Structures are given as structure tokens and as C-alpha cells.
């Protein structure tokens, strides 16, 4: 996304996703992610410290960390039962981002690319197919609560990880890592050379 021309970056910002263009953290720290997943209370949407401090996690936090919309209608994922009207391929999305002029197809390609790679990744290289279909079949201009969707999806991923022990945690664990690394939370969590100390 760094190589996109300014008019495309402006269109992404106008959609409410400008924060993704400025993400500073692009590498996951697996020891920290493992600790976050073990300490996360899905039922109450909070991170529980050993010091009995609980840090709530809300869609507003997702908006502040990732710079995506946290208002509007809820995202409803439609399960397609017929043949899809497109191919699920990240390379096609990358080509669309590079080659298409700013317009509805460009914006849909960006949304799907962002969700397949950053906001709602799963163990497949191309993300959740039903989300592709939902975005392709909807209007881009409708304001949606993408932050709430991201939080629900990563919480569902944590739940699946705990119950079925897959090798991959689906969802935006990058959000959780950046969230706990913010100055506001560093007073609660001190991270030093992959060891976690509670202040």
C-alpha cells in the first residue's frame, strides 16, 4: 500500500481507512501474542492482568489503533450457496489496487485486500470468501461498523484457538499487539526481552 499514488491514498482515507496507511507495526511478536490470547477474557471483552487489573477492549479502541470506522450498520456476512461471480485471488486484488482508477471497484478491492491481509486474516492466503462476496455485493458508500467486526472476528479466532487448538489464530492479532503496546497500557504491562513483567 505504500506504493499507491496519492489520489488512491486519499480515496482510502475518505473511506475512513487512512489509519491502515500509517500502521507503524508490521511484525508480530509471537510471545506477546501468546500471552495476550491467554490473558484475554472474551465474555467481557477485556485483557486481564495478573495484578487483577482489567483493560477493556472496545470497537473504539480498534478505531483508534487501526484508524477504521467504528460507527454505522453492523456487518452481516452472507453465505453464498451458488457459484461466486469472481475469483478469490489476492494477486488480482493487488493488480486492481495498482491498475484501477479510483472508483467503486477500486474501493471494494481495497476493502477485501485489507480484510484478507490485515483486518480479518485466516489460515487461507486469500481470507474469508464469504466476506469477499459480501463486499462485492454491497454498496461501498454505506457506512459500516468495521471496527466492531474486526473485534468480533479476532475474539472468535481466540475462542476457536482455545477450543480446537489450530496452529493459526485468525483475526487481527496485530491490533491486540499494538493495543497493549500503546503508552496508555505500558504502565500496566512492561515487556522486556520477551519476558512479561506487570508494573
Regions found by a protein language model. Name each.
Residues 1-104:
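N-terminal leader regions that mediate targeting or early regulatory function
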Residues 71-73, 85-199:
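Long, internal protein-protein interaction and assembly surfaces
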Amino acid at each position: 500500500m505504500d506504493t499507491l499514488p496519492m489520489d488512491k491514498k486519499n480515496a482510502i482515507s475518505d473511506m475512513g481507512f487512512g489509519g491502515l496507511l500509517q500502521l507503524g507495526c508490521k511484525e508480530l511478536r509471537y510471545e506477546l501474542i501468546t500471552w495476550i490470547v491467554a490473558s484475554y477474557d472474551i465474555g467481557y471483552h477485556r485483557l486481564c492482568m495478573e495484578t487483577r487489573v482489567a483493560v477493556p477492549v472496545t470497537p473504539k479502541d480498534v478505531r483508534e489503533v487501526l484508524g477504521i470506522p467504528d460507527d454505522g450498520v453492523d456487518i452481516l456476512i452472507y453465505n453464498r450457496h451458488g457459484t461466486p461471480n469472481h475469483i478469490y485471488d489476492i494477486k488480482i486484488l493487488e493488480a486492481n489496487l495498482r491498475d484501477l482508477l479510483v472508483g467503486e471497484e477500486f474501493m471494494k478491492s481495497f476493502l477485501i485486500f485489507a480484510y484478507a491481509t490485515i483486518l480479518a486474516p485466516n489460515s487461507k492466503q486469500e481470507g474469508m470468501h464469504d466476506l469477499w462476496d459480501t463486499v462485492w455485493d454491497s454498496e461501498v458508500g454505506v457506512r459500516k461498523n468495521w471496527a466492531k467486526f474486526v473485534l468480533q472476528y479476532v475474539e472468535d479466532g481466540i475462542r476457536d484457538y482455545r477450543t480446537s487448538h489450530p496452529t493459526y489464530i485468525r483475526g487481527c492479532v496485530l491490533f491486540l499487539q499494538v493495543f497493549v503496546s500503546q503508552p496508555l497500557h505500558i504502565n500496566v504491562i512492561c515487556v522486556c526481552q520477551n519476558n512479561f513483567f506487570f508494573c
